Regions:
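Short acidic (Asp/Glu) patches
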Residues: 46-49, 63-68, 91-102
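Charged, gly/pro-rich active-site loop segments
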Residues: 73-139
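A generic structural signal for nonpolar/aromatic side chains embedded in well-ordered alpha-helices
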Residues: 9, 55-56, 96
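Short beta-strand segments
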Residues: 12-48, 56, 63-67
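Helix-adjacent hinge/juxtasegments
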Residues: 52-79, 83
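Short, catalytically relevant binding-site loops at active-site mouths
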Residues: 34, 49-51, 70-72, 117
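Extreme N-terminal tail/first-helix region
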Residues: 1-16, 138-139
Length: 139
């Protein structure tokens, strides 16, 4: 993955993610995330009772965005991604709690979105500059 994408995803903390609901329709949710830069995963906390986690029975495939909140056109940056969501393993949980240490007291379930394909748009690199990435070892 391009180092500029890694730097951006490490800097940010809020993702908008879309799952598929029981009627086959898109269902969007937002979540704080930690980025696993070794395995290229977004790690987030969510309850088994949440709608989006329940919808994983329909499809583990998700899509989403991470975007810088700015009104300055020259600073616009963001990622559009597709991935596969599953329960996080122990090392991924450690990464999440290293970033959001205060969440550990609530002992939330941590989920991992394995990034499979993404497009990074950055006006910082040049107006409308896009960098695409795709995982070579597809799930």
């Amino acid at each position: 993955m391009d180092e500029r994408i890694v730097k951006f995803l490490k800097k940010m903390h809020l993702a908008s993610v879309c799952a598929i609901d029981d009627e086959g329709q898109p269902y969007a949710f937002s979540a704080f995330y930690a980025f696993d830069e070794v395995n290229f995963c977004l790690l987030l906390a969510s309850s088994d009772d949440s709608s989006h986690v329940k919808f994983l029975k329909n499809s583990k495939f998700v899509a989403g965005t991470v975007a810088l909140d700015t009104k300055i056109v020259g600073k616009i940056e963001g990622v559009q991604f597709q991935g596969v969501m599953r329960e996080a393993n122990a090392s991924e949980r450690e990464i999440y709690f290293k970033r959001f240490f205060y969440a550990k007291v609530m002992d939330p379930k941590i989920w991992s979105i394995s990034l499979e394909k993404l497009k990074f748009t950055s006006n910082v690199l040049g107006f409308g500059k896009k960098i695409k990435w795709e995982r070579s070892d597809k799930i």
